[in-house]
Amino acid sequence: MNSNAYLEAQRWLSHPRVKPNLKEVITAMSAEEIEHFFSLKKPSFGTAGVRGKMAPGYHGMNVFSYAYLTQGYVNYIQSLNPTKKPLRFLVARDTRKHGALFNGIVCDVITSMGHVVYMFDNNEPTPTPLVSYVIKKYHFDGGVNVTASHNPKTDNGFKIYDGHGAQLLDFQTDQLIAMLPPVVTMLDFEPRGNNELLHFLDNEVVYKNYFDDLKESLVVDNDSFKNLPVVFTGLHGTSVKLLPRFLTYLGYSNIISVQPQNVFDANFANADHLNPESKDTWELARQYASNTKAKLMMAIDPDADRFAIAEWNPQTQDWHYFSGNESGVMVAYYKLKHKQFKRQPYIVTTVVSTDLVDKIAKKYGAFVKRTNVGFKFIGQAVNHFSKDNELVVAFEEAIGMMASDGLNREKDSFQAAAIMLEIARYCHNKGISLLEFYRGEIFGEFGDYYNWTVPHTIHGVNWKEKMEQVLHQLTTATIKEVVGHKITKIKNYVDINLVEYVLENGNWIKFRISGTEPKLKLYFNLSNGYLAALKHEAKKMHEFLVRLLNLDKA
């Protein structure tokens, strides 16, 4: 065990500000956990802020670490506005355990530093896209969101924004971290909040403005087929009240609520899985769909940025769960065909998203901007390009999208629900399914594509180091092909922890370390063939790579 980490753990055990329940947790920690949570390294930001297990220590999410991080964040935002004081911040939270406690600490730090804080009335759990919207709409200088998105219920997080409602980029968080004092000062910082600088928003006014602005982003808004039965689950998260209200506002009259999951619950009692990318997450929704004969289901993750849609496929007698790539492509194709753009249309997506969107953009006169993985990069790109161009869609392969550049700078499940239900109604009017629209109309025009993302969990608190070893192995491997597909080039993007195998015929495989979870993700982009054959090839490639890299099964 690292002796410094052990000594720091002892310091926490003897410190009067550390409560007895936290001391019990420290006492029960393994040597590996002590080394992780009590490391003297400064914290690091992932693709969506700082996330981690709620635990004592410099690298656990606790009242001390939130105060420490907030102090650095406020100093950074002040450095961008050196002559402005007080600054104005929005502070919000999701439905997770200790969220109210943690954002209370954040408020105390900000007000103790002489700045103004706005919160939602009653400290109401708030969707992440709405946080970004309010910062941008009301011209705040920044904002803090206490959320861990779809991470396990044991986790929490610290997500921060600039005055445009966009997440800070890596160079900005690097500057923020440089402003932080040594982590050993964490226990000695006692913020004294000033309630005179704390204000509350009128939630109903904010919701109305948001709904009105969202409605303006639709392509075609009429009353046809708004009685389509659609099952909805919000997984105990921040959308469970607002999303049904929003869809009712748009005129939808047959939204079927998965009631056990559509209540706030910090323990996520009726949702064992929180990521709509996982089919296991949909178990209860499938039961509701079966009982009501609904052919469409929607799932939204706990902080309401990720939206996913699934459709019953009568041919396979099973559900098809649309990926982020598939949803993003459908929105891009639909809007470019049916919307009149007043300025140059553009699409923003990431380096691991499907190449199909480039073909669509080229045919219909749009351009594509690709960013690093993480919506913080997408949001900042939209912020840049929206000045002279008009957004078609910004999307991630991991089921997140933004369909309007006028609202916010986050992936937005409300925007996604509105536009995807609009497309579903368009398909219903044509007598086709969403899947037929995607594989029939779009593939018929541009050829078949198969994009597949496979996450592999890496165990242990030192998971990042283990995965860095895997990436090194990939770049130094002597293999020339992957099950018959010649590798024409190996690209190593060290700064974003990504390795690419460029294959023949424009195909590729990419390997990336997740910035938010202990996972190595494999991305396959295959074309120039029929879908069934492409799927078969991807499966063989994956099996080969699992053996090569000695990975656990996904």
UniProtKB/Swiss-Prot annotation:
Protein name per its UniProtKB record: Phosphomannomutase
One Gene Ontology term of the molecular function aspect: phosphomannomutase activity
EC number per UniProt: 5.4.2.8
Note describing how the cofactor binds: Binds 1 Mg(2+) ion per subunit.
Catalytic activity entry: alpha-D-mannose 1-phosphate = D-mannose 6-phosphate
Family of this protein: Belongs to the phosphohexose mutase family.
Keyword vocabulary terms for this entry: Isomerase, Magnesium, Metal-binding, Phosphoprotein
Organism: Mycoplasma pneumoniae (strain ATCC 29342 / M129 / Subtype 1)
Catalytic residues identified in the record: S149 (phosphoserine intermediate)
Residues given in the record as Mg(2+) binding sites: S149, D301, D303, D305
Cofactor needs: Mg(2+)
Annotated GO biological process: carbohydrate metabolic process; purine ribonucleoside salvage
InterPro entries: A-D-PHexomutase_a/b/a-I, A-D-PHexomutase_a/b/a-I/II/III, A-D-PHexomutase_a/b/a-II, A-D-PHexomutase_a/b/a-III, A-D-PHexomutase_C_sf, A-D-PHexomutase_CS
Recorded superkingdom: Bacteria
